[in-house]
């Protein structure tokens, strides 16, 4: 049939028709694969950029953590030094009162360590001449003078000439020892033993 058409056309004196150009249409699969490949390429580049930024952030955080770790180490060393200083101070504080306590205990036994007022005889105590004499001589003289007689009471404190007559007020206690000189205390203890 085509040969017949060609013969008719040539008989009429017409030119030979040019061959028809067929346009090539890409297949659907090729289009989809191209778009997929292009999208995946862009996605991979985007992910690569994000990972690179994440790595940079991790490096920065690691540097900051290293700096903080060194700072924490310095603080730990300071804390350990302060703890050792506190322990040594506690040891000094626990041992110092014991040494000072011996002196305090030893000082309590004598009236010399306590602050005293000037040794003046109390009113009512007839021992104005005791301070200028030897305590042992005074005790011997008092014992000779105040020997009890059969007709007199045995208590020396009831006699008006006794030095302790002014110290007793009925059944009341003696004068506080801190207000009296040591010689007077020895005098009173000797008379009480008699």
From Swiss-Prot:
It comes from the Eukaryota. Residues 39-68 form a coiled coil. One of its GO terms (cellular component) is cytoplasm. Keywords: Coiled coil. Residues 135-145 have a biased composition (Acidic residues). InterPro entries: DUF4677. Residues 101-176 are annotated as: Disordered. This is Coiled-coil domain-containing protein 184.
């Amino acid at each position: 049939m085509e040969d017949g058409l060609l013969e008719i056309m040539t008989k009429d004196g017409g030119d030979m028709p040019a061959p028809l150009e067929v346009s090539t249409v890409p297949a659907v699969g090729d289009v989809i694969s191209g778009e997929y490949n292009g999208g995946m390429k862009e996605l991979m580049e985007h992910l690569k950029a994000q990972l690179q930024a994440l790595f940079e952030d991790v490096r920065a955080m690691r540097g900051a953590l290293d700096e903080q770790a060194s700072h924490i180490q310095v603080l730990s060393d300071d804390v350990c030094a302060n703890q050792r200083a506190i322990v040594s101070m506690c040891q000094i504080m626990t041992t110092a009162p014991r040494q000072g306590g011996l002196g305090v205990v030893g000082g309590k036994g004598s009236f010399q360590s306590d602050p005293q007022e000037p040794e003046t005889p109390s009113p009512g105590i007839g021992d104005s001449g005791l301070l200028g004499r030897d305590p042992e001589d005074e005790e011997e003289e008092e014992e000779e003078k105040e020997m009890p007689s059969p007709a007199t009471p045995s208590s020396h404190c009831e006699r008006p000439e006794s030095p302790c007559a002014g110290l007793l007020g009925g059944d009341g206690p003696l004068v506080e020892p801190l207000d009296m000189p040591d010689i007077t205390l020895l005098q009173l203890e000797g008379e009480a033993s008699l």
